[in-house]
Amino acid sequence: MKIRPLHDRVIIKRKEAESKSAGGIVLTGSAAGKSTRGKVLAVGNGRILDNGETKPLDVKIGDIVIFNDGYGVKVEKIDNDEVLIMSESDILAIVEK
């Protein structure tokens, strides 16, 4: 199944949460928590401005991004991957290599 986000929406596949603490302790269950990083799978055409023009998004397909855990809407699995749909404004940062 393919999904194309509209306007300023972004589809993100959440990355696996770290299973070890900084001290090397293996974390399980809720202690591991949910990752707040993900890979951008698809982006909309852009945000529609008050004057009717469309501003392209800053994030691109393939970017690794950081977002707040409470943001985004979970969607059914797409190609066996659970994805989130969120507005670009809910993304806090792009991880640069």
Curated annotation (Swiss-Prot):
The keyword Cytoplasm applies. InterPro entries: Chaperonin_GroES, Chaperonin_GroES_sf, Chaprnonin_Cpn10_CS, GroES-like_sf. This is Co-chaperonin GroES. Heptamer of 7 subunits arranged in a ring. Interacts with the chaperonin GroEL. The keyword Cytoplasm applies. One of its GO terms (molecular function) is protein folding chaperone. It comes from the Bacteria. Gene3D superfamilies: GroES chaperonin.
